[in-house]
Amino acid sequence: MMPQLTDDFLLLCGDVIIDVNFNRFIAFHKAHKAWASLISHPNGHPYDSSLLVTEIMSPKEVGGMPEDTHRVIRWMNKEDERLYYKNRVNAGVEIISPELLKETMKNFTPRHPENPNKIDLDRDVLKPNIKSGKIYAYDTPEYVKDMGTPDRFHEAETDMLKGLVYARNLKNKQKAIFLDRDGTINKLAGFVTNPEQFE
């Protein structure tokens, strides 16, 4: 499987429209010394997408709030039974290390004996190597959309014309809402001295 590859490489599926800060993505990949880093995001059709489950460190382990390590511990294909899941979808944009390919070829058994060179990246390479602990999910709020159906293509085209694709890149300032622990949103009213001043 591509023995001439000696460096990590970026792989983009052809039906994805994306505008992300790739420097952040590359830094994440290097910091985790990953065999593969997968851009992940919530989408509008998780029922027909591969979902990623990542390791969560308990509050006892980290001394505070639960912490997501971003290490992928489970890969759910669209046909797998799903009782409960977080909408965290593999976007089809990955940084892949040659080590992942070498490890895959050590134990690779073709699922299609009639065509042994046919390899499915998700099912034959990424999913089987989760046990290595070196596959990571890079969550981003940036614009990532699978436009593999006519409806999704139209949505992506509309978003592009509205400027939404570019605007969501993290190199641009983003709008944010901060909530306190009970989820209350208060209007900024300066120094509040009694409850009647809250809006």
Which functions belong to the PLM regions below?
Residues 13-14, 181:
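Short acidic donor-binding/metal-coordinating loop in glycosyltransferase active sites
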Residues 176-199:
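Alpha-helical substrate-recognition element adjacent to the catalytic core
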Residues 6-10, 17, 23-30, 41-46, ...:
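Catalytic-core segments of class I nucleotidyltransferases/pyrophosphorylases
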Residues 50-53:
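Extracellular disulfide-bonded cysteine-rich modules/repeats
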Residues 171-174:
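Short, small/polar residue-rich loop motifs at catalytic or cofactor-binding pockets
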